[in-house]
Amino acid sequence: MLLDRLKADLAELDTRALRRTRRSLATPCAPHARVDGRDMLAFCSNDYLGLAANPALTRALQTGAVHWGAGCGASHLVSGHYAVHDELEARLAAFVDCERALYFSTGYMANTGTIPALVGRGDAIFADRLNHASLVDGALLSRAELHRYAHGDPAALERALAASSARRKLIVTDAVFSMDGDVAPLATLLELAERFDAWLMVDDAHGFGVLGPGGRGAVAEAGLASWRLIYVGTLGKAAGVSGAFVAGHADVVEWLMQKARTYIFTTGAPPALAETLLASLELIERGDERREHLVGLVALLRRELTLARWQLLPSRTPIQPVLIGDNAEALAVARALWDEGLWVPAIRPPTVPHGTARLRISLTAAHCADDVRRLAQALNRLEAQR
């Protein structure tokens, strides 16, 4: 029976230490949280600037709800597009120095809608092997040829581009890779896009608000500008709210508005969220002190960790992965940390390649130095004991 097979598949997940579970928070997003009835110090959140519970954002959300109501009532192309959505898109485009931006309800929807709108059968996509699942799914939905090149290897990408006779080419990459914390070689990728007449789509989910001048992201940090660039920024991470946007040349964004199915065939995001995001953008622009504090915490963690067998992967971003390897051991270490009041997620396949299970430490500007030292001391001790 189908249900028996499903139960067997679930049991197999347990056997391989791959079943995922949820934990329930009873407090707002912050490092010190009440989780499943316990007081915990959390290193899980991608609220990198500590804005999710910022009073200015909660006030903006309240004001927006009073003015605009709870929902928008329709899709953007029917009657669900409000003046505050226009204002947000204009502000986002200006912030990342692009001609125009389009606001999506989620980052997943932005990626899975944008890629199939740009390429299809007869076209080719060239994707870093460690791209986020939403980029992979968008590529598969497009039905274009999918070439996955070795992670961070522009030479492999160049060979694939040179061998392709596709009518349209799209290079797709994370800016900051979510499970490793490293940054893509964006300048080299843009040079290849120009040489081989390709689009370059950059998903800056973990760079927007954190990297670059004024938090304008990894593309701004690299000093890049081109009509070929299609920039995706996430608004539920450093921005502390929800949603995502795609920015670029005005004609590209117009095309996405006409063709991106995840934009067209869904009710628009509540205008109160757009109101909140306008307040978030102001805090991001003025957030140099937060970003400097975050850089200091990253440096402190890397100094304090003295691991011998486990590997702290090279990363200058708030994502600091500790590679353990074995699924069961990674889970056991995460449980041991949990027992000490430290919440650090164990990341396992299929999110990461087999044999690379890890702890994914996420630092935020809301952490303090003592928080980081406490975590480092616990990890050093646990590794020595195992």
Swiss-Prot record:
Substrate binds at residues 20, 132, 351. Keywords: Biotin biosynthesis, Pyridoxal phosphate, Transferase. Its EC number is 2.3.1.47. It catalyses: 6-carboxyhexanoyl-[ACP] + L-alanine + H(+) = (8S)-8-amino-7-oxononanoate + holo-[ACP] + CO2. It comes from the Bacteria. Belongs to the class-II pyridoxal-phosphate-dependent aminotransferase family. BioF subfamily. This is 8-amino-7-oxononanoate synthase. The lineage of its organism: Bacteria, Pseudomonadati, Pseudomonadota, Betaproteobacteria, Rhodocyclales.
